[in-house]
């Protein structure tokens, strides 16, 4: 499906291509190659409904002033089959199109007919995309970085699905390596402490209170039998039990946050299956692995990285990077056209070597897209809430959802671009005022539901779309709402192409603002029946789009507040 705005953009682009070709044929513009014509919706109201910078794009290759090119384009422009009322040249050579006010009324039947599918696109054309996100070590609870990644990854996956991609959500379980060994040692100490032994937890151990609870749970179920086991068996047994408990807890926490994964993928399985060795052998055969100082190195410098990277340590144990290469190789083996990873910004140094390793294995490095997230700071009463995973003092995702609610948490985590540092104001997220963007947006939906409910209580049916005359919606507040509703499919396309859920968050806030402004200055039910019926259908359209957009971010659309 294509939205009203995209249809108009497409028809204007075709008309402009014909116009510039005509201008070249007449000698009004020097011969040149015609680029793709980009049509945009101007940010400023006074700059028209649509605009293009085509004349400025052509100025250099044509060796002409952009305004002169713009004049030639307009002279050759056939707008007979468009709804363009007038065309103006602005600034250095922008071409601004002003449409007949009635153009935007066409969005009303489109929204009513498509309903839950309004905004859905075929942009992805069924391409398979994997989104891997959170993938936290299963050795503790989920912190704010994990929470931001969960909201971002799940929202992005929903947007891509809505845009026509076949999406798989995946969690990579880091259940191998040094952190698991350290986890086993920490569990052993806590186990022995619980059974009366005077033993200290090393400084580098896991100090969170949660592992004490895990050990108590193990003792309640299995007793003291591990006291008689050897150290290796004791640590492995406790680690296996704790990992299962932690993973179950993580799954349930994410489920409560509205995140459901299609695949949970074990790092240990890569070791057990021989996939890591197989991948390293392939890289060696291709000439990208060499031995130095009794270790094996990947030639990351061959792919633009500053230094090569160890993949097998001198003790013969593969590094985390080696497992990561094998894991990503398997993603492509499973048939994904694109792979999207969401990482913390502290992993930025890992990006180029990861892409390089995929290129070394024969894949297009650009098909691996990595989104880096900046840090989250929690604020309460204007003061920073300190977080420390090692000391067990950080605020967990569970605690956050309990304090502010799932909807507020999810919206706040995606309302800024992931490359921006995020200050999460707990007081604002809990407030029931228009300053809280979540309250502001959801209240718009609830307000509309209240209007429609009152109509039903009065025994009046919602007007049929065929029975209304949308052209009576002439007020600027009404036209602004209609233009914003018409923009929704374009916003979906932009959010999908730019991997930017924050665009949908911003769109929601803007749409809610336009609705509240309209509602505060206009009565929906008036003495004029034609206007009343048109406005009732208009607010129903706003309700549909609010609900659709809220759903993409994993938020509810309440009918009462």
Curated annotation (Swiss-Prot):
What's the EC number here?
A: 6.1.1.19
Catalytic activity from the UniProt record: tRNA(Arg) + L-arginine + ATP = L-arginyl-tRNA(Arg) + AMP + diphosphate
One GO term of the biological process aspect: arginyl-tRNA aminoacylation
Q: Kindly give the InterPro entries that the UniProt entry links to this protein.
A: aa-tRNA-synth_I_CS, Arg-tRNA-ligase, Arg-tRNA-synth_N, Arg-tRNA-synth_N_sf, ArgRS_core, DALR_anticod-bd, Rossmann-like_a/b/a_fold, tRNAsynth_Ia_anticodon-bd
Protein biosynthesis in keyword set: yes
Q: Which GO terms describe its molecular function?
A: arginine-tRNA ligase activity; ATP binding
Subcellular location as annotated: Cytoplasm
What Pfam families does the annotation carry?
Answer: Arg_tRNA_synt_N, DALR_1, tRNA-synt_1d
Coiled coil ranges = none
Going by the UniProt record, its keywords in alphabetical order are:
Aminoacyl-tRNA synthetase, ATP-binding, Cytoplasm, Ligase, Nucleotide-binding, Protein biosynthesis
Q: Does the keyword Oxidoreductase apply?
A: no
Q: Which domain of life is it from?
A: Bacteria
Which cellular component appears as one GO term in the record? cytoplasm
At which positions is motif 'HIGH' region? 136-146
Q: What is its main location?
A: cytoplasm
**Which proteins does it associate with, and in what oligomeric form?**
Monomer.
Q: Which family does it belong to?
A: Belongs to the class-I aminoacyl-tRNA synthetase family.
Protein name (record): Arginine--tRNA ligase
Instruction: Please tell me the species this chain comes from.
Output: Desulforamulus reducens (strain ATCC BAA-1160 / DSM 100696 / MI-1)
Q: Which gene encodes it?
A: argS
């Amino acid at each position: 499906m294509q939205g009203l705005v995209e249809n108009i953009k497409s028809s204007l682009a075709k008309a402009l291509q014909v116009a510039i070709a005509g201008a070249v044929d007449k000698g009004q513009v020097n011969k040149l190659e015609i680029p793709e014509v980009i049509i945009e919706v101007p940010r400023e109201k006074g700059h028209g409904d649509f605009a293009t910078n085509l004349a400025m794009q052509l100025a250099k290759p044509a060796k002409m002033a952009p305004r002169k090119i713009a004049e030639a384009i307009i002279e050759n422009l056939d707008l007979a089959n468009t709804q363009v009322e007038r065309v103006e040249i602005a600034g250095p050579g922008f071409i601004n199109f002003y449409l007949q006010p009635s153009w935007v009324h066409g969005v009303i039947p489109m929204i009513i007919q498509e309903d839950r599918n309004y905004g859905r696109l075929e942009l992805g054309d069924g391409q398979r995309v994997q989104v891997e996100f959170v993938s936290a070590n299963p050795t503790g609870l989920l912190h704010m970085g994990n929470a931001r990644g969960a909201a971002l990854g799940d929202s992005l996956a929903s947007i891509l699905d809505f845009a026509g991609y076949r999406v798989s959500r995946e969690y990579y379980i880091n259940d191998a390596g040094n952190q698991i060994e350290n986890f086993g040692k920490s569990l052993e100490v806590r186990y022995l402490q619980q059974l009366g032994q005077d033993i200290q937890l090393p400084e580098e151990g896991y100090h969170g209170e949660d592992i004490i609870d895990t050990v108590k749970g193990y003792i309640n179920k299995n007793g003291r039998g591990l006291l008689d086991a050897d150290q290796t068996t004791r640590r492995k047994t406790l680690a296996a039990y704790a990992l299962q408990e932690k993973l179950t807890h993580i799954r349930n926490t994410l489920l409560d946050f509205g995140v459901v994964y299609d695949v949970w993928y074990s790092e240990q399985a890569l070791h057990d299956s021989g996939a890591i060795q197989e991948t390293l052998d392939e890289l060696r055969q291709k000439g990208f692995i060499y031995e130095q100082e009794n270790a094996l190195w990947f030639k990351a410098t061959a792919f633009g990285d500053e230094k090569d990277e160890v993949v097998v340590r001198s003790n013969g144990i593969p590094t985390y990077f080696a497992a990561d290469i094998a894991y990503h190789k398997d993603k492509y083996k499973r048939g994904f056209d694109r792979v999207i990873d969401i990482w913390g910004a502290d992993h930025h140094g890992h990006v180029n070597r990861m892409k390089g390793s995929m290129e070394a294995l024969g894949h297009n490095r650009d098909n691996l897209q990595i989104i880096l997230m900046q840090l989250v700071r929690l604020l309460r009463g204007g003061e920073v809430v300190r977080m420390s995973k090692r000391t067990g003092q950080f605020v967990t995702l569970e605690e956050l959802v309990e304090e502010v609610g799932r909807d507020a948490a999810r919206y706040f985590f995606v309302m800024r671009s992931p490359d921006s540092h995020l200050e999460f104001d707990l007081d604002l997220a809990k407030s029931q005022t228009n300053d809280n963007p979540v309250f502001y947006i959801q209240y718009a939906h609830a307000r509309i539901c209240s209007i429609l409910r009152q109509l039903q209580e009065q025994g009046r049916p919602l007007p049929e779309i065929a029975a209304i005359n949308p052209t009576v919606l002439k007020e600027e507040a009404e036209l602004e709402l209609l233009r914003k509703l018409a923009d929704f499919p374009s916003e979906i396309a932009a959010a999908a192409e730019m991997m930017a859920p924050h665009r949908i968050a911003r769109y929601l806030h803007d749409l809610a603002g336009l609705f509240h402004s309209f509602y505060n200055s206009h009565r929906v039910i008036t003495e004029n029946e034609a206007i009343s019926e048109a406005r009732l259908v208009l607010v129903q359209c706003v309700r549909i789009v609010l609900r659709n957009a809220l759903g993409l971010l994993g938020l509810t659309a309440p009918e009462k507040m």
